[in-house]
Amino acid sequence: MPAGLRAVVSYVEVEYQMSERHACRLMGLGRTTHRYRARKAERDSELRARLKKLAAKRMRFGYRRLTAMLVREGMPTNHKRVYRLYREEGLAMRIRQRRRIRWRGAVTSPAATRPNERWSMDLVSDCVATGRVIRMLTIVDGCTRECPAIEVDTSLGGLRVRRVLDRIASERGLPEAIVLDNGPEFRSRALGAWSEERGVRLEFIQPGKPVQNAYVESFNGRLRDECLNANWFTSLSDARRKIEAWRQDYNQQRPHSSLDYVPPAEFARTRAEMRA
């Protein structure tokens, strides 16, 4: 039991004013083993400090995502070492496990294998400090997991949705298909006409089965957990500013577990360079 012997050696050194060499010989413990703990603590000090600082800023991140960010910063570490410090510092959060429901006969779209092959789109609701409800149009690329836009307003009709899609298309091109639910904004004539004019296929999921639009549903969960629930929006403009800041961070900085803990924008760039 080296840990116990190290403690005894330290006690003997102090209590009997004995040298380290004599105390180690008396207890049958090598001096290298005795010093190991001190060196280990010294090696961990910088990593521990950075981990605590990062965890304070990224309160909803677990140790694996924090590990990815530390590695990206150039710190020599691995997930086991980070997990040990994560537990020692009491940074682990209790997460309520959600009940997973498996839908029988669920029809899901094939996984996208290239950018703009298939987008996923949905609407999310929240409110500002005055109690006024705000709506968010969320869009995710099924291949790169990038979020090209989160449109925030008090109402978002079909005409507004098509304008947002045209704006995104002017920057990155049109998708081949969009997966979406059966909400009135998406079943509108305006969006139907847009899809025919642009040659974009609309793939509507079955009513009451959001699992068929899993990519955007997962994204919406992260949006709510890391942004909506973590912020107090004083006004519509304040909500727009904070949500856009979160979107930029999601695309550019946040490690994505489905992309081997690489941020979506970096994944998209690397993919484009490999295909060039």
Question: Which residues fall in each region the model found?
Answer:
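Charged DNA-binding/catalytic regions of mobile-element recombinases
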Residues: 1-276
